[in-house]
Swiss-Prot record:
Belongs to the diaminopimelate epimerase family. This is Diaminopimelate epimerase. The keyword DNA-binding does not apply. It comes from Vesicomyosocius okutanii subsp. Calyptogena okutanii (strain HA). Its EC number is 5.1.1.7. The gene is dapF.
């Protein structure tokens, strides 16, 4: 079957985006991993699929697959690309655009400068929502010998405070943490260096995709944790390898992610 696709990225976190409103395209893990291969396929961190919603007031179903073929709950950078895609393809003229992910409903607002602001919902520090198998909620948890904050942004995140993100062995540490029995669904692992109360450096090892140039939900998780710990103010610039994301979070409220979403190319591929 020959399908149309669009290649996009948000701060270097790259995506293959597909319109499946007709419901005639079926993906499986083998197809996805083949398409994600950067040497023999399209190459991407995540596959984003636009599907119809059966929920009143919700414009689309936003389906996300990691490059290993696993379906995941949330992707903030992908949400920005999703918004620009459905607008560019004239699939909707709504603004904001409301979409249903695997875990929750989020709102996407297109700005005049082609950036997108995503209402990522309310972060949860409840271990059951992550899930994290611990007896009670705490400011931090010791997992595989590391002190970590744990947060759900609709998907699971752990955050480690570090002095310098450039000297951390991200892959080795993240893989060790992900193997913990305390994290039955694993987690995205963020390494946060606080520069001041409005600015951080961040690297994120994404579950199912390894380290990426940017992770929107990871940026939200890091800022939410920093605000809750009194280390950050409500407006924070997050410096990622692929560029800067802007996060706004008031303790106990919703968290907002703003940043660019870029088109790279379009094409057709046999699946």
């Amino acid at each position: 079957m020959l399908i149309n696709f669009t290649k996009m990225h948000g701060l270097g976190n790259d995506f293959m985006v597909v319109d499946n409103l007709a419901g005639d395209i079926t993906f499986n893990a083998k197809k996805i991993t083949n398409l994600a291969n950067r040497a023999f396929g399209i190459g991407f961190d995540q596959l984003l699929v636009v599907e119809t919603s059966n929920i009143r007031g919700v414009d689309f179903r936003y389906v996300i697959y990691n490059s290993n073929g696993s379906e995941v709950e949330q992707c903030g950078n992908g949400a920005r690309c999703f918004a620009r895609f459905v607008n560019y393809k004239n699939l909707t003229h709504s603004n904001p655009i409301t979409v249903k992910t695997r875990s929750n409903i989020i709102s996407l607002h297109l700005n005049d400068d082609n950036t997108v602001c995503v209402d990522m919902g309310k972060p949860s520090f409840n271990p059951a929502d992550i899930p994290l198998l611990v007896p009670q909620q705490s400011e931090y948890y010791q997992i595989e010998g590391f002190d970590l904050g744990a947060i759900s942004i609709g998907n699971p995140h752990c955050v480690m405070l570090v002095k310098d993100v450039n000297t951390i062995d991200v892959n080795t540490i993240a893989l060790k943490i992900q193997q913990s029995e305390l994290l039955p669904n694993q987690a995205n692992i963020g390494f946060m260096q606080i520069l001041n109360t409005h600015e951080i450096n961040l690297r994120v090892y994404e579950r199912g995709s390894e380290e990426t140039l940017a992770c929107g939900s990871g940026a939200c998780a890091a800022v939410a944790y920093g605000v809750e710990q009194g280390l950050l103010k409500k407006n924070v610039v997050v410096h990622l390898s692929g560029g800067d994301a802007l996060i706004e979070y008031t303790q106990g409220g919703h968290i907002f992610l703003s940043g660019p979403a870029q088109f790279v190319f379009e094409g057709q591929v046999e699946i």
